[in-house]
């Protein structure tokens, strides 16, 4: 993705599980995005379920895709 200065950090809720470890996440502002897990979450075998609250990073250049960086308890 882009440099750290160009990323937006937002919170949302997992709405749907998609094939290939992708997720439909609805952000707090109501905008839907397609997200994938970051590498450290994959290596730690962290799984997401529908309804989980997550923190995502988005590029300022493409506001339709995101990366899940944290799953809230």
UniProtKB/Swiss-Prot annotation:
One of its GO terms (molecular function) is translation initiation factor activity. GO terms for cellular component: cytosol. InterPro entries: NA-bd_OB-fold (IPR012340), RNA-binding_domain_S1_IF1 (IPR006196), S1_domain (IPR003029), TIF_IF1 (IPR004368). Keywords: Cytoplasm, Initiation factor, Protein biosynthesis, RNA-binding, rRNA-binding. SMART domains: S1. Residues 1-73 form the S1-like domain. It holds the Pfam family eIF-1a. CDD domains: S1_IF1. It is found in: Cytoplasm. Belongs to the IF-1 family. Component of the 30S ribosomal translation pre-initiation complex which assembles on the 30S ribosome in the order IF-2 and IF-3, IF-1 and N-formylmethionyl-tRNA(fMet); mRNA recruitment can occur at any time during PIC assembly. One of the essential components for the initiation of protein synthesis. Stabilizes the binding of IF-2 and IF-3 on the 30S subunit to which N-formylmethionyl-tRNA(fMet) subsequently binds. Helps modulate mRNA selection, yielding the 30S pre-initiation complex (PIC). Upon addition of the 50S ribosomal subunit IF-1, IF-2 and IF-3 are released leaving the mature 70S translation initiation complex. This is Translation initiation factor IF-1. It comes from Chlamydia pneumoniae.
């Amino acid at each position: 993705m882009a440099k750290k200065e160009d990323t937006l950090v937002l919170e949302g809720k997992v709405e749907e599980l998609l094939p290939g470890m992708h997720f439909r996440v609805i952000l707090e502002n109501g905008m839907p995005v397609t997200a994938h897990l970051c590498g450290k979450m994959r290596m730690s075998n962290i799984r997401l379920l529908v309804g989980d609250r997550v923190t995502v990073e988005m590029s300022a250049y493409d506001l339709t895709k995101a990366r899940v960086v944290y799953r809230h308890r």
